[in-house]
Structure formats: C-alpha cells, structure tokens
A protein has these predicted regions:
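Hydrophobic small-molecule pocket/channel-lining residues, especially in calycin-type beta-barrels
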Residues: 24-191
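Bacterial N-terminal signal peptides
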Residues: 8-20
Length: 191
C-alpha cells in the first residue's frame, strides 16, 4: 500500500469518525429560518442616543446624550448572535458595556437573550419576537431601589446601513409606559 493510499484511508476514517457523532446528536441540524432575524445586528456600528429625564434635571441640562459602539457576530454554530454594546456619556465617561448572547428557541418560538453589564452585572433575561418590520424585545426586573419594572425594546427602521432602538419602561405591570425612555440611533461602520 502506497503512502498516498494509506493517508487517504486514514483521512476517510477520521472524517467519518468525527462527523458520525455530530449527525447522531443533531448538531448538524439546519438552523430555523427565524435564527436569521437578528442578522441585521451583525457588523460594527457607531451609536448615538439619549436618555429621557424629567423634572429639574431636564429643565437645566436637557436629555443626557450617549455615544458608543456596537459590534455583533454570528455564533460558531450559526444558531445565534453574540454582541457587545458600549455606551459613554457626553463627557466620555463609560456608562455601560453589555455583552449579549441571543439564540432562537424553536420550542418557544422566540429569541432568548442573556446580557451581562461590566458595571452592573447580569441583566434580567429577555425574549424577542419579530413583529412586522421590527424586532420587539421584552424583559422585566427590579431597580437597585427595589422597584419592579418592565422594558420593551423596539428595533425599528432596519436597513443595511442602520437601525433605531427605542426602549420603553413601565413601573405598573404594563398598564402605562414611559415611551422613549432611551433612544439609540445606530449607523454601520463595518462588516
């Protein structure tokens, strides 16, 4: 047996040995079509935005401005998205650096989203669904003061060049909403 034939047989054996368990446990199963709904996030982005405030602070200073970057990539298995959003205030002081993991659940027919802020720790888990031309993400949690809230985050005006993110907040189980509590305008800077 020649060296070439011997190597070809070994390679054939190894490929079969590695791929057989993958096929058996379903790891090579195709992603659900919905697993592409957050693909608009993939790339590098420049972020500008503002936070809604009221009362004396708003009268004196106006709405606090935010600036930052957002980068996102598909997970290695192709079933989800990982992304990192970094925001600073107008003076350049870091306010938030959040790493998100987004994966589509076929069983629940929605996106499951986990986030961790470098300054605040773990964020409440969220879910998201495509609704017409937007992605709608919802979550609930408790403020540091112990006040329960709900968030709904709209990803709107989605184009290859950018999108808008608007976050609403409710402190009464969704009966009333503070709309536009935070607004981010996101523009693509790279792939």
């Amino acid at each position: 047996m020649t060296l070439f034939v011997r190597r070809a047989l070994i390679l054939t054996f190894l490929v079969g040995w590695v791929t057989a368990p993958l096929a058996a446990d379903g790891a090579s199963a195709a992603a659900a079509p919905e697993a592409r709904q957050f693909d608009f996030l993939v790339g590098q982005w420049q972020v500008s935005g503002e936070v809604k405030v009221s009362g004396l602070v708003a009268m004196i200073h106006g709405r606090p401005k935010l600036a930052g970057s957002w980068k996102a990539w598909r997970t290695a298995d192709g079933q989800g998205i990982e992304d990192e959003l970094t925001l600073a205030d107008a003076s350049g002081t870091p306010r938030s650096t959040v790493h998100f993991t987004r994966s589509f659940s076929r069983e629940e027919n929605c996106w499951k989203i986990m986030g961790r802020d470098a300054y605040k720790g773990a964020l409440p888990p969220a879910t998201a669904r495509r609704q017409g031309d937007e992605m709608l993400m919802t979550s609930s949690g408790t403020t540091p003061e112990g006040k329960h809230y709900r968030n709904r985050t709209h990803y709107l005006a989605i184009t290859p060049a950018g999108f808008r993110m608007v976050q609403d907040r409710s402190y009464d189980e969704g009966k009333t909403w503070d709309t536009g509590a935070m607004t981010l305008d996101v523009r693509r800077t790279g792939n």
